Regions:
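Glycine-/small-residue-enriched transmembrane alpha-helix faces in small-molecule transporters
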Residues: 1-33, 67, 71, 75, ...
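Hydrophobic/aromatic residues within transmembrane alpha-helices
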Residues: 21, 31, 35, 79, ...
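Hydrophobic alpha-helical transmembrane segments
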Residues: 1-6, 33, 59-63, 90, ...
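C-terminal ends of transmembrane helices
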Residues: 42-54, 98-110, 157-166
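Small-residue-rich packing faces within the transmembrane alpha-helices of Major Facilitator Superfamily
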Residues: 12-13, 37-41, 97-98, 122-123, ...
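Specific transmembrane alpha-helical segments of multi-pass solute transporters/efflux pumps
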Residues: 10, 14-15, 44-92, 99, ...
């Protein structure tokens, strides 16, 4: 329970931290370059320490995953310039709705609970972002960027599930 609480605290706190950094004047590109460079170096050192030897298929898979992840982080971070942290966190969390929908699009079957979950999440999104009297109910550009981020999170999770069947996890992670 403590681990779950700590994870939620770190994940939730990261939205506020990213918003402060972006509002402080650091460009999204510079922030993400720094973040991905540090993360890549750390994982690269671990892969080297464990003597990971990726094949060409695994390298291509990891490159594709990395490109999608870069767009995800770009959309989410840039979206924070226009929307609130609470809206961003909730909208991003809608990836749990989009992941099964992406799976459906590539031929997997859905359970009825997925449809119910999608409806409940859509209602929650409406209640969170709707501001009567404002144009488009208060929906803004940052909300749109973050929604695209959530859709791509679903794509990324589905891609990871597919690629992990054929590629080494260390290679996919780095």
């Amino acid at each position: 329970v403590l681990g779950v609480g700590l994870t939620a605290l770190i994940w939730g706190g990261s939205f506020a931290a990213m918003k402060l950094v972006v509002q402080g004047g650091l460009s999204v590109g510079a922030l993400l370059s720094l973040r991905f460079t540090l993360g890549g170096l750390a994982l690269g050192l671990l892969a080297w320490a464990f003597k990971a030897k990726p094949g060409s298929r695994a390298l291509l898979d990891s490159l594709l995953l990395g490109l999608v992840l870069t767009v995800i982080f770009w959309l989410q971070t840039d979206g924070l310039r226009y929307t609130t942290t609470s809206k961003s966190a909730f909208i991003t969390g809608l990836y749990v709705v989009f992941t099964p929908l992406v799976s459906l699009a590539v031929g997997d079957r859905l359970r009825p609970s997925h449809g119910i979950g999608a409806l409940v999440a859509a209602l929650g999104l409406f209640l969170l972002v709707n501001e009567p009297g404002k144009p488009f109910g208060g929906w803004n550009f940052g909300d749109t960027e973050t929604l695209l981020c959530a859709v791509l999170c679903g794509v990324h999770i589905s891609m990871t599930a597919h690629f992990s069947r054929r590629s080494d996890s260390w290679t996919l992670a780095t």
